[in-house]
C-alpha cells in the first residue's frame, strides 16, 4: 500500500508548533513596535537636548527662570520650535519643562496608530551636569519611578537608562 500525504497526527503536531511559535513571537513583536515608537520620541528630543546643553554652557545653569512661565517662552529662549511643532508619527510634542533642563516627550493616542502601552503617555529626559559634561537619563515620572499610568520602563531606550 502506497500512502501519500501527511497523517492527522503529523498535521496536528505542525499546527501545535506553529501555535507555540506564534504565542512567543507576537508579544515580542508588540514590544518591538512599542520600543520603536518610543525611540522616535528620543530622536525628536535630540534638538532640545542640544539647545539645553548650549544654554547650560553659556549661562552656567539650566533654563529655570520664573519669568518664562509658558512652554512657548521657554522654547523661544532656547531657539526651539513650539512644543507641538516638534512632533512625529507617534509623538504629539516635545517640551522643555521648567524643572532644571528636563525634557518631556508626550505620545499621541491609539487612534493615531500608537501602541496601547505607549499611547497618551510620556517620558522625561533628565540632565545631569555634575561631572562637567551633560549626560541624560530617561525616567517615567518626576520621581523617576514608573507606574502603570505612565510609560513602562521596559519600553524606554536602553541608551538613556
Residue ranges of predicted features:
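Alpha-helical protein-protein interaction elements
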Residues: 21-24, 47-48, 54, 128, ...
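Periplasmic/extracellular, small/polar-rich flexible segments of pilin-like filament-forming proteins
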Residues: 57-161
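N-terminal single-pass transmembrane signal-anchor helix
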Residues: 1-49
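Membrane-proximal N-terminal amphipathic helix
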Residues: 34-64, 70-73
